[in-house]
Amino acid sequence: MRASSEASLKAAADRWEPVLAEAGESARDLAESIFAVVDALDSSASLRRALTDPARPADAKASLTQGLLGAKAPDAVVDLVAGMSRSRWSADDDLASALEEIGTTSLLAAAESRGELERVEDELFRLGRSLIGARELRIALSNRELPVENRVALVDALLEGKVAPETELLVRRAATSMRERSVPNAIAHVGELAAARRRRLVAAVTAAVPLTQGQLTRLGEILERAYGRSVQINVGIDPEVVGGLRVQVGAEVVDATVLTKLEEARRRLAG
């Protein structure tokens, strides 16, 4: 993807994270709905163009999305796709690729909510390694001329009951969506997403009033410097929160005073 599509994907993924946090294990259902949208986009060049045409008004693209999906998908997924159709995409197939990644992230979030993310990451790594030495299986899974249902049956025969359900679904997608040049490459990419998600920290922020994008960006920078890792910020609103802001990272509660001191210390060091 080019820079504009990457920026649109990141913005959509950031907006989607609070939905995943609230969904818990149900994020798996959201993922499957997103994948259904991806399949529809992949099968219709005219639909891809209609939802990504930069000359078409953003509101018109969002209305088209809402009309097409309507009651066919959860409200959260309709809102996600409508919002993404408003964004700028460098190529008409980038929207589908971005949704594929968000669907994948949703499955990983479902595994994470069950405490199984590390297991899924490990299973993906092991499977990718085993495919390197299994030429016939690798070719069969990557064969675009083989009907999709045959590739799904092959994955099920290989993995059903032996791995986490999210792992099996992710490998199914790798074998059917064929966005990467080969299934091992697709599995490796998903494994990288799983590893990145497992390494990140999540900050649950409760604010007395909604934070501006600038405030969120600054807060994220302060927390990332403090913890030395990427921090995902999920925001909730409570008018009665003490001090106007409450931040919890893991089991640690960080109040507004501590954040102020961290920022002041950073400025002194920078100066």
UniProtKB/Swiss-Prot annotation:
It holds the Pfam family OSCP. It is a peripheral membrane protein. GO terms for cellular component: plasma membrane; proton-transporting ATP synthase complex. InterPro entries: ATPase_OSCP/d_CS, ATPase_OSCP/dsu. It is found in: Cell membrane. Keywords: ATP synthesis, Cell membrane, CF(1), Hydrogen ion transport, Ion transport, Membrane, Transport. The keyword Cell membrane applies. GO terms for molecular function: proton-transporting ATP synthase activity, rotational mechanism. F-type ATPases have 2 components, F(1) - the catalytic core - and F(0) - the membrane proton channel. F(1) has five subunits: alpha(3), beta(3), gamma(1), delta(1), epsilon(1). F(0) has three main subunits: a(1), b(2) and c(10-14). The alpha and beta chains form an alternating ring which encloses part of the gamma chain. F(1) is attached to F(0) by a central stalk formed by the gamma and epsilon chains, while a peripheral stalk is formed by the delta and b chains. HAMAP family: ATP_synth_delta_bact. F(1)F(0) ATP synthase produces ATP from ADP in the presence of a proton or sodium gradient. F-type ATPases consist of two structural domains, F(1) containing the extramembraneous catalytic core and F(0) containing the membrane proton channel, linked together by a central stalk and a peripheral stalk. During catalysis, ATP synthesis in the catalytic domain of F(1) is coupled via a rotary mechanism of the central stalk subunits to proton translocation. This protein is part of the stalk that links CF(0) to CF(1). It either transmits conformational changes from CF(0) to CF(1) or is implicated in proton conduction. NCBIfam families: PRK13430.1. Belongs to the ATPase delta chain family. This is ATP synthase subunit delta. The gene is atpH.
